[in-house]
């Protein structure tokens, strides 16, 4: 009887749905395990095989943990607000809601066809008013705590999309061919900087990949430095700069300010004013990426003004350059070209002085020297000397001297900036704020504030969202007077900042989440998703979670205990899958040809989960043959009914193999080493096939080990051998420690530490026996001939080493 995967998979998917097999209760008597995928944006292109990798890994973990006795929460939902649906609406007139619902049906169908054990009763959708009611509620709480405010700020404006982009989104959009410019706009901003220290400190508690934690540390960018005042010659003002290297003050030879600095035009002399104005105008058209790229040519303009170096008394020219950002530090820097590569390049380009103040092994006129480890030189005046001091001592001495002279003060700075939260588009959560004619703002109290129906989805001519074109929704009045609703909507990140909490209590209309359920289920034990979200979703979600912690809504400081980033699956051409390359492998096509179990096993067998690897159709053919081999263990080649299994004891060699497989598969599954777990199951299947053994215990053990990976075929075979309950309810087997020990071991023989041969010996053999066998080994015997043995070293079960010298 051949294995027909399409019939089997359809049968068991229908049965799981009918039986609510994976519906999760809030059973506080059982240990819990919360495993979560980064929920998808349901795009019109559907899922390809690369998307399935993380979902498969989380499902294997969920099924394995259930078999280990855990109450497992494994939910799925949709991050469904977003720009693509709105762009499609602009082109076609199709309401984004219609497009989104159709895309969700397609996505859900694919996920169900993969046999993923999600509790679909907890399904959420960020565009559902019952859901975004609570997204809006969180925004109001942020506003009440002073963490949401309005400001006219320079934003990243995408002309083609007619909307603002967060700093973190700019790189991707430019790479996609969009034009991004800077322009001032009234925006809602979230004060994420108020949580910078906590976001930084709590990273140490997390079981996350170190590279992701480091990316967040770099993005937050905490630095300790000094703000220094430079007297401006001829202006009776001071220019304050921020530096992390006050120890190099004696080497500062020029200052640079941002084009947006309030003194930029004021410092321009009459001769320089036109050039300065032109430079500032051009700089404002550039994105931060264009301005700060390390590879770009440095540009600048001299203001004509000078400032006095407080350490040397020398006048320093004040320049304007677009690589200095007004949003970081004070928007002004001191430049020490001998010891900073960017300053060195700028100095070389504009023929500015370069003075060595950190002892360098080479000529700093020819090459910059940036190491901190060396000592200070050429750094003394009548009041202070740094000469001979290492960095830390020089930093402290200079900082103290500047504070004593009231010429500076210690300061902590962050690269992290407040989160520009509003978007000029329709398909997003309305911001629940009313603007009254007297200038006051009041909160919408009747939540959810839902989106109105519109005929046109184009942004308004003023740069506002399409909501500005709908008078009946836009204007209103109440006991406080006439008002105009906020027309900006929230970014797509809003709904994903807290969705993991709603899965815990999705039907609750009175609270965001029931406190008792939250205490039971949180934190998320395992969160699986791509590393591309390191400084976007993951940072924003941590910020909102900390606010909710301060509000008493959640009981933990962090949402995600363990994070795992799966590697990308490339196309067969070893390139990232994309429509433009024509190398996308749609998930539905592969499922139709090979079935879900083969796809699940193949994707996990490709290599370590965290590594990038290419798809290979020949490989999945091999997995299909493996599944057929498993099938034949129960059905045989030509039998229409399952083979009668034996209750007789299995051979000892097979018994040992089985217990080794239990141990290996369990340990590897626990550690997400799925490829090696599958390899071990293949070894076990080969041993079963070779032995011809039809022992019930052996077959049942194999099926339970394999069931998290290939749930459909194992359910079918489990039923075929006489079980009337789901294999997902079968406990994971335990191994006998005595049976996993090797009975015959390979012992290495060394002479003077060099491997000269090996031999086989029973485990726990006495030292005397090991020495005898080692000396009799043919390849070793010839090396001992004519040698005097000075010492014999025996490590039981591992090696024998002879220390010798020539006679």
UniProtKB/Swiss-Prot annotation:
Keyword Ligase assigned: yes
Its EC number(s): 6.1.1.4
Catalytic activity: tRNA(Leu) + L-leucine + ATP = L-leucyl-tRNA(Leu) + AMP + diphosphate
Cleaved signal peptide residues: none
Pfam families: Anticodon_1 (PF08264), tRNA-synt_1 (PF00133), tRNA-synt_1_2 (PF13603), tRNA-synt_1g (PF09334)
Keywords from the UniProt entry: Aminoacyl-tRNA synthetase, ATP-binding, Cytoplasm, Ligase, Nucleotide-binding, Protein biosynthesis
Gene that produces this protein: leuS
GO BP, sorted A to Z: leucyl-tRNA aminoacylation
Lineage of producing organism: Bacteria, Pseudomonadati, Chlorobiota, Chlorobiia, Chlorobiales
Primary location group: cytoplasm
SUPFAM superfamilies recorded: Anticodon-binding domain of a subclass of class I aminoacyl-tRNA synthetases (SSF47323), Nucleotidylyl transferase (SSF52374), ValRS/IleRS/LeuRS editing domain (SSF50677)
Location of this chain's protein in the cell: Cytoplasm
InterPro entries: aa-tRNA-synth_Ia (IPR002300), Leu-tRNA-ligase (IPR002302), Leu_tRNA-synth_edit (IPR025709), M/V/L/I-tRNA-synth_anticd-bd (IPR013155), Methionyl/Leucyl_tRNA_Synth (IPR015413), Rossmann-like_a/b/a_fold (IPR014729), tRNAsynth_Ia_anticodon-bd (IPR009080), Val/Leu/Ile-tRNA-synth_edit (IPR009008)
Name of the protein in question: Leucine--tRNA ligase
Native organism: Pelodictyon phaeoclathratiforme (strain DSM 5477 / BU-1)
